[in-house]
Amino acid sequence: NAGRCDPAFPFCGITLPGGAAGRPLPFGRKDNAMQNIRLLDCTLRDGGYINDWNFGFENIRDIVSSLTRAGVDIVEVGFLRNVDYDPDRTRWNTVKELKSILPADRRNVLFSGMALHNFYDIDKLEPWDGTGIDLIRVTFHDYDITEGLEFCRKAQEKGYKISCNPINIMGYSDEGVLWLVEQVNKLHPFAFSIVDTFGSMHQQDLDRIVSLVDNNLAKDISLGLHLHENMAQSFSLAQSFLNKHLVGRDVTVDASLLGMGRTPGNLCIELMADYLNLNFGKQYDIDCMLDAIQDHILPIREKEPWGYSPPYFLSARYNLHRNYAEHFLSKGDLSNRDINHLLSRIAPEKKTAFDASYADELYAAYKDHRINDAAARASLQKKLAGRTVLCLAPGASLSTHKAQIEAYIAAERPLVIAANFIPADFSADYAFFTSGKRFEKLAARPCPVLATSNIAGKADYVLDYNSLAGAFQLGSNSLVMLLHLLADLGVREAALAGADGYGPD
């Protein structure tokens, strides 16, 4: 074990900038120029979603010890919850219970726990005495901010450092973020964290939110960042966050060993520590982290793997609660394409809190509309082969530009398809319907009718609705669906008329 992390050897053998010549800085200690960046490990808390927090008592102690020796600035040891004490799990009923897993030599490491106001009785929280956790990170939704901040206030009065961690900051408007920051300033906690709950953050989102918060949050409140791997961007975003070099602001980045956390996982702390060592003069001991991964985390991942997965990318793409993706995955008969289309149809008011009944309604409707339309497509493909198509939409410009449209038809002799109506002033070769209400109002059918499978009633050609409806804002628009069909059938050129209100984008 000569090459392993040795608790009896707490010093690095390399002198770093800021250290006295020949006297290296001990792990966990930072010189004045380095004090504004902290690395927080959340393996025992966020990683616990993988194994129901059942790490085992000795494993918990060893993970905490390894992270402490590695020089991690903040080690989160689990949740404060209203649960019966189980020494093998990192969910604690009292601070007294968790003291048994903390090392005797704390090495200036801050130890933290996380709490939700409605899952933990604040009256059970003992006053801070310096021998338990130092920091309590409190999460709250946009609908219970007042209750969350009141919990923060009470914990702060008991002597703890507090971090306010609002859930899904991507769901806040700019005005909402500014209002929240104003309330946090009144409380004046130790830290405020930008939490990308659904893993939906892009670079421009990070830039916007960091700018809003940094320019309005009191400068002596540390700013944290908690990311997820839904879109495989957590390491890139964390680097960007640090490279902003926020003036006069302490910052904290959350990460976990091997990125352990609910699929797809979190930012890998070993990667982040290495990046900080190379670029910010830090001296985290990567070996201690790698030992903990090998001894404790890899055996868990063999039983319950995590990592990038398309359904969780899609849940992030639409900024949805992750349980929607898991719910549709559990059906067992949906492709990633199917899940994409289902997630795209979730109403805005249903996105943040998972609604199983609502999800089942979407699933049932989706299944009802799914058909095999290969024969209909093959027949249409033959009829459309080599033809230019004129798509008519029911806009007022059909009347105001009637002469121009007639001239185009006479000159180009296109095959004419009307979208969701039968034109009165033009002769259509086909009518394409995606709306049941429009279809039911047909008094006569002067041309063959193409209808999608969501419509009840007889049509000459029935086409699968789900394969034509796109997973984007106008994906279920009849004209867009018609163009989708034409592209699928190999039509190379189409003209539009009556598409009032549409632009080239």
Protein language model features and the residues they cover:
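Catalytic cores and adjacent flexible loops of soluble metabolic enzymes
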Residues: M34-A374
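Short Gly/Ser/Thr- and charged-rich N-terminal loops/segments
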Residues: P17-A21, M272
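Low-complexity/repetitive intrinsically disordered segments
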Residues: N1-A2
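Metal-ion/cofactor- or nucleotide/acyl-coenzyme-handling active-site neighborhoods
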Residues: I371-D505
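Short, Lys/Arg-enriched N-terminal segments with co-localized hydrophobic residues
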Residues: A20-A33
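Extreme N-terminus of proteins, especially the signal/transit-peptide cleavage junction
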Residues: D31-N36, K383-G386
